[in-house]
């Protein structure tokens, strides 16, 4: 790159952010975009480390220093081509990845100078290239005559479809929802990811040759057996939608909401999607408590304030430092008026026929658990009741295996996750192959609830396993 001391002379600059009082009026993305000049300047801050920790920390192992260099040289189409070699959804990951604990958190410049704005540049690459007419080059791809059914149009399914299509295998993607994306569309609010971004990705993939069959639920609208009969292989990428309960009294009271149905209902309302059985949950003028400290909890907090809730409180059982979600999202929630109660363990949702409050106990952090995080320990005599009209439970998600899995020898573990090893075993000859040799799986329904980018990675890896299975 041009100037060896660019990282000193040019400070880290993030895209402009809409002021809190303005962004609360809608569900639009809150971050702006780099113009060409600023993108080049920020990309040129990269040190091009010999051992790039950013690349290692990225779950898909993006060629980050290489495409930063291309952006700095204004070679945007080449940067787009390179970013798509490792990531099927770079414009989406650039928006929703927690870069502060992945690539940017591993940047050599993070301490003292400010990490390179990797996520914002990643978003800039695809947004700009698409706007200028760039599309993935499949001119040298030869059709193999093979076709694969993919169940689930979320990150894992899209990642799988991308790799298969680039290898000459016809990918047909089934999804029960009216639009692709899975939780990208229906779970992640528009202020983090505008739905037009996902809609554009659908157009790009359809131009590549991917076929989408939406509003189609396998096992209900189409029997799974027909997929086994008509396709050379099947990939399962249905994600995790079942919420994890807290196990305390009062969870069944009216006014207690699961995080995901709440977020989905809001997206359906904003986008005017008509989904059978869905009803809009409006928090206007209500006192809302959100339980949890991850990104989904922040999505619920920030959605409720946009619905004009009277007050939104986020209660978390550990301290702020131990919150599992993105620090950026916590900061955004605070700016938007969300109150935080740290070291509060919920023990009961109280009320007579409806939610009236949340009983919590203050905690202190004790010895580390098996994951190295210090356990919350209740402080004796510290119970209190926080008044509330609604409680949103955002403790995470787990897979809910389809009832027909056992009929087709698709094994799951004790947590309901499909058993599909990431490497060859005695029972699985190919990557991400299930106990049914013709069926592969990846993403959250294999690893449990995780990041968008890890689901993309596993979908892509599963596609490689399918290609080996098909001898393509």
Model-identified regions with their sequence ranges:
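Beta1-alpha1 glycine-rich phosphate/pyrophosphate-binding loop at the start
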Residues: 5-32, 61-73, 82-84, 111, ...
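Ferredoxin-type iron-sulfur electron-transfer modules in oxidoreductases and energy-metabolism complexes
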Residues: 23-41, 63-95, 112-141, 267-270
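A structured beta-alpha segment of the ubiquitous adenosine-cofactor-binding alpha/beta core
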Residues: 35, 207-228, 276-280, 343-389
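Local cysteine-cluster metal-coordination motifs and their immediate loop/turn environment
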Residues: 44-63, 88-111
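Glycine-rich dinucleotide-binding loop and its adjacent helix/turn
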Residues: 125-142, 203-220, 243-307, 414-429
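Short hydrophobic core segments
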Residues: 151, 231-239, 289-291, 389-396
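FAD-site-proximal beta/loop scaffold in flavoenzymes
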Residues: 252-285, 368-449
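A conserved FAD-binding loop/helix module that cradles the flavin
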Residues: 300, 445-471
């Amino acid at each position: 790159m041009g100037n060896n001391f660019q990282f000193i002379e040019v400070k880290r600059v993030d895209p402009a952010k809409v002021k809190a009082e303005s962004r609360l009026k809608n569900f639009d993305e809150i971050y702006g975009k780099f113009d060409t000049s600023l993108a080049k300047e920020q990309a040129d801050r990269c040190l091009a480390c010999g051992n790039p920790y950013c690349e290692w920390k990225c779950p898909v192992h993006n060629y980050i220093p290489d495409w930063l260099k291309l952006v700095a040289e204004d070679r945007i189409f080449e940067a787009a081509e390179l970013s798509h070699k490792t990531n099927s959804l770079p414009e989406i990951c650039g928006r929703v990845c927690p870069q502060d604990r992945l690539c940017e958190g591993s940047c050599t410049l993070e301490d003292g100078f400010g990490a390179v704005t990797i996520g914002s540049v990643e978003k800039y690459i695809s947004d700009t290239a698409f706007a200028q007419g760039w599309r993935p080059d499949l001119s040298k791809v030869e059709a193999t005559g093979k076709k694969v059914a993919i169940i689930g149009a979320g990150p894992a399914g899209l990642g799988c479809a991308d790799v298969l299509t680039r290898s000459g295998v016809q990918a047909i993607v089934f999804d029960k929802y009216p639009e692709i994306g899975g939780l990208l569309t229906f779970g992640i609010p528009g202020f983090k990811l505008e739905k037009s971004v996902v809609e554009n990705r659908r157009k790009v993939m359809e131009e590549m040759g991917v076929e989408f069959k939406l509003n189609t639920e396998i096992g209900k609208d189409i029997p799974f057996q027909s997929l086994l009969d008509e396709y050379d292989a099947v990939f399962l990428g249905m994600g995790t939608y079942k919420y994890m309960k807290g196990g305390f009294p009062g969870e069944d009271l009216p006014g207690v909401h699961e995080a995901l149905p709440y977020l989905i209902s809001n997206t359906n309302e904003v986008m005017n999607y008509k989904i059978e059985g869905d009803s809009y949950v409006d928090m206007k003028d209500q006192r809302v408590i959100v339980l949890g400290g991850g990104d989904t909890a922040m999505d619920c907090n920030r959605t409720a304030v946009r619905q004009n809730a009277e007050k939104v409180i986020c209660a978390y059982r550990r301290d702020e430092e131990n919150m599992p979600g993105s620090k950026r999202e916590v900061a955004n929630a605070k700016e938007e008026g969300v109150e935080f109660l740290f070291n509060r363990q919920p023990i009961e949702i109280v009320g007579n026929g409806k939610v009236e409050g949340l009983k919590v106990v203050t905690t202190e952090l004790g010895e580390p658990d098996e994951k190295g995080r210090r356990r919350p320990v209740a402080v004796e005599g510290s119970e209190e009741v926080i008044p509330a009209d609604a409680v949103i439970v955002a403790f995470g998600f787990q897979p809910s295996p389809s009832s027909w899995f056992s009929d087709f020898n698709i094994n799951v573990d004790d947590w309901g996750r499909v058993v599909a090893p990431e490497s060859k075993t005695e029972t699985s000859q190919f990557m991400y192959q299930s106990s049914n040799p013709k069926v592969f799986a990846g993403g959250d329904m294999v690893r449990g609830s995780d990041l968008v980018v890890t689901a993309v990675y596993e979908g892509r890896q599963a596609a490689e396993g399918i290609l080996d299975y098909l001898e393509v």
